[in-house]
Structures are given as structure tokens and as C-alpha cells.
Amino acid sequence: MKESLRLRLDQMVDRYEEVTALLSDPSVINDNNKFRELSVEHSDLMDITTLWQNYVGAETDQADAEAMLKEASDPDMKEMMQEEIDSARDTIVEMEEALNVMMLPKDPNDKVPAFLEIRAGTGGDEAAIFSGDLFRMYQKYAQAQGWTLEVLSANEGEHGGYKEIITRVSGNSVYGRLKFESGVHRVQRVPDTESQGRVHTSACTVAVMPEVEIDDTVNLNPADIRFDTFRSSGAGGQHVNTTDSAVRLTHIPTGTVVECQQERSQHKNRAQAMKMLISKIQQVKVQAQVDAADTIRRDLVGSGDRSERIRTYNFPQGRMTDHRINLTLYKLDSIMEGDLDEILDALLREHQADLMASVGGA
């Protein structure tokens, strides 16, 4: 391991011990904001500190075993010491790989909630139906993770599914898990309306954007925001379509449009829509895409054309293929039931490998 990395890890251990002590300080305990901030830092440092201490311990074990091997004369003792050396060496290699991953640059948005948007692309009614299938897939995954998924806006398809559905997902590390889902998702299957049994191909777009904290870097002039109301079209019992409680906000300079019809209260919908609007505009600013907030969605998902797919769901073959990492799994039924960890873990490993390559080449 490089000496510079050892130094950084030792510094992190020192900081971990410092933060641990601060969390017992009465002045910190009485300051809710400071205590919360240090608790998050303590949690972030705990795993890497523990792993680094175990790594150092394994190095010590290896060195002790090597010293004993040199002194040993008994063949059985030599064999036992060599086994200990080999075991310690394997452990060190595994832990060094894990430490390298943990030291990679972190996306500050990985732990925040996310807006998940699904839109029907090419394929007409079948694309809308598949949008509904994707929504239920993510909904079940969110439930399995203990996350909360809220539907903010939904435009239902004529024969089921959704032409568009926008949700907010909150919980632990939501954006970090879902951010690789952005792109065109292609489906190949025989529609229920197909009498000849022919396989049809259609597509949906998925966009995942972090819910960034509102700060002073985004200042919206109220005169630049057009406020419209309309009647909710989704679930809501007897109150649906009786009042104009749904809200649409348009940021005129960028053309950014957001809608929210989750609540029966127009006031609550407006507050949520404003949060969505600021999040979108702030993310555009962070990525230096000042032309319009819609640019970020095009970068994330493409145009919705089947040729721009990131993933294909082939129902006749029970197959899912992620084209970015050449991963094919023959368990489509369980995937559509929300079994996404194998896919998401593989995408994360590929991302980490790319980061390590870029850091190594820097």
C-alpha cells in the first residue's frame, strides 16, 4: 500500500477518535445541529476506521508469523506458520481492495432522497403499460429497502400503466442506489392485445435526480414562475376532480415545468412543487447546464428511442440485459418483483472500477 494512503487512513482514525470524544461533550450534546452533523461524520468514518485497524492487525499477524517461521525448526510448526502467513496475506489483499474502494471520491448526493420519473417512449399503449410495470418494480424495491415512495404526479395510459409518473423516494442512500437507473429501458414481449402472438418492442425513459438541499445559491424571482392549477387525475377518492388542487409551476427563463397532485391541499402541492422546481434548477446549475433544466433529463435518458437503450427486458426469454456492463440475468420474473440488488451492485462495482482507473491515471 502506498505510504500516502497509509497517512490519510491514519489521519482518518485520528479524526474518528476526535469525533467520538466530541460526541460526549455536553456542549455538543446540547447543540442539536452540531450533534447531528458530528453523528453523520462519525458514522461515515466508523467502517473505514474499523477496516483500517483490522488491516494493520493482519499485517502484524503476518510479520509475527514470518518471524516465528524463521526461528522454527520443527516441520509441523513451519507448516502451521506458513499457513498463517498465507491466510494473513489473503486477508490483507481483500482488505486493501476494500479500503481502496472506500477511499474513492464520494458523490455528496448519494445519501439524499431522489425524484424518480418514468415516461412512456416509443411503443404507444404498450410503452405506457410497461411504465406501470417499471413503477411497480421500483415500488417493490423501495418497500424491500424500507424506503418511502410518494407519487407526486401521474398521467395514466388509456389501456393501463402511465404515460408519465413522477415520484419522490426517501430513505437511506436512495440516490446512490438508483442513480444508474437513468436511461432508456426497452421491453420485448407479446402484448395482451396481440392476436398473432408477435413480439413487440417498446421503450420507456427513467430519470433519477437527487433532491438537493435548498440554499442561497438558487434565487428564484417569483415573477419568473408561472403558477397554474388543475384537477387531480389520480387516486384520491371522492375529492378527485372536484377541486383544482393539483399544481403546475413553470420557470419561464429555463422552461422547467413541474407538477404535483399528491395532496388534496393546493397549498401542500404548491410547496412540494416548489421544492421539486428548485431541486431541478439547482442540479442544472451544479452541472453547468444553464440552457434549461430539461437538458439534464435528455442527458440522463436520451430521447426515448429504442436504439438508445441501457437495458432490455425480454419476456419470452425471461431475460434482462444491461447493455452498459454486458450483464445478462435469466430471472426476469424476480427482477420485475423488485429483485434489483444484483443489477445495482454490478453497476456500482463498474462505476467504482472506473473511478479507480481515473484516480490511478491522474
UniProtKB/Swiss-Prot annotation:
Compartments where located = Cytoplasm
* SMART domains the UniProt entry points to: PCRF (SM00937)
Record carries keyword Protein biosynthesis: yes
Q: In what way is this protein post-translationally modified?
A: Methylated by PrmC. Methylation increases the termination efficiency of RF1.
List the molecular function annotations (GO) for this entry.
Answer: translation release factor activity, codon specific
Family, similarity comment: Belongs to the prokaryotic/mitochondrial release factor family.
Entry protein name: Peptide chain release factor 1
